[in-house]
Curated annotation (Swiss-Prot):
Lineage of the organism: Bacteria, Pseudomonadati, Pseudomonadota, Gammaproteobacteria, Enterobacterales
Domain of life: Bacteria
Protein name as it appears in the record: Coenzyme PQQ synthesis protein B
Pfam families from the UniProt entry: Lactamase_B_2
Record organism: Klebsiella pneumoniae (strain 342)
Key word Transport present: yes
Keyword Transport: yes
Length: 308
């Protein structure tokens, strides 16, 4: 299985366009060792030629321009994106669909709950009907495996996770199980598995078996501490309010990852306030000591028989 990180940041990217927090200002003036990042998205493939896009960030045009794998040679217009899977209906995972309108129709897999949000509160399905058939919805049900024709050797399973519905959803603060899913992806040729969860609020007992059997975890690294935005003076929400489990809490993401046997544990969806973006920070060193990696834009991962 081939995996490539298109974007590794949370909503707003890094540096965020209107932010002068210590990280954003430090990156701009060169006083911290860090790299710019676009908003969260990945692609996966079973052959390195045809790809499935997992979430479409607002930065998708820039991401495609920097990803030669997605250029389809030999055709006047085309793409190597053979399907799109959405893990939720959040703006930073769906706005990019609008930028892909010239390539419609697109085959899109998502839960009925996500489809409802994207047909009402943020109606991209409705809007894009005017572009060559728009988005063709393929419903997915939690814990029911499915495949995408472009990559038949990849088996996807949507796993419900605890997080929140977006502000424009009528289910805000009372989400249904299909509003947020992780993806458990198995490469059927060798049995290697990836667990992809860019937004994870509170792991429960039903989620643990999926985490425990994954060879590689690509998982929520949004905030270091729950009150991070408040402490930085840039917002009132906690990580938990936004549906994200803080890394450093007593029962946070680092503690969870320490208990799991995956060969590689990689963080994605990293907020611009998170101190781990500074490669020389104590927090970044703490991750290294636990064998936890921080993804970057353009990071390539290959799952093989012996290691991932």
């Amino acid at each position: 299985m081939f995996i490539k990180v298109l974007g590794s940041a949370a909503g707003g990217g890094f540096p965020q366009w209107n932010c002068n927090c210590a990280n954003c200002q430090g990156l701009r003036n060169g006083t911290i060792q860090a790299s710019a990042r676009t908003q969260s998205s990945i692609i996966v493939s079973d052959n390195g030629k045809e790809w499935v896009l997992c979430n479409a960030s607002p930065d998708i045009s820039q991401q495609i321009a920097h990803t030669p794998e997605l250029n389809k040679p030999g055709v006047l217009r085309g793409t190597s994106i053979g399907g799109i899977i959405l893990t939720d209906s959040q703006i930073d995972h769906t706005t990019g669909l609008l930028s892909l309108r010239e390539g419609c129709p697109h085959q899109v897999w998502c839960t009925p709950e996500v489809h409802e949000d994207l047909s009402t509160g943020f109606p991209v399905f409705t809007m894009l009907r005017h572009w060559n058939g728009g988005l063709v919805h393929h419903p997915i049900a939690p814990q029911q495996p499915f495949t995408v024709d472009a990559c038949p050797d990849l088996q996807f399973t949507a796993v419900p996770i605890a997080s929140n519905a977006p502000p424009y959803s009528p289910y805000r603060d009372r989400p249904l199980p299909g509003h947020n899913v992780a993806l458990f992806i198995e490469y059927r040729r060798n049995g290697q598995t990836l667990f992809y969860a860019p937004g994870l609020g509170e792991p429960d007992e039903a989620l643990l078996p999926w985490l425990q059997k994954a060879d590689c975890l690509l998982i929520d690294g949004t905030v270091w501490q729950d009150d991070e935005l408040q402490a930085a003076g840039v917002g009132r929400n906690t990580g938990r309010d936004m549906g994200h489990l803080a890394l450093s809490d007593e029962h946070g993401m680092m503690a969870l990852l320490a208990s799991l046997p995956a060969k590689r544990k990689i963080l994605i969806h990293i907020n611009n306030t998170n101190p781990i973006l500074n490669e020389l920070s104590p927090q970044r060193q703490a991750l290294k000591q636990q064998g936890i990696e921080v993804s970057w834009d353009g990071m390539a991962i290959t799952l093989q028989d012996t290691a991932c």
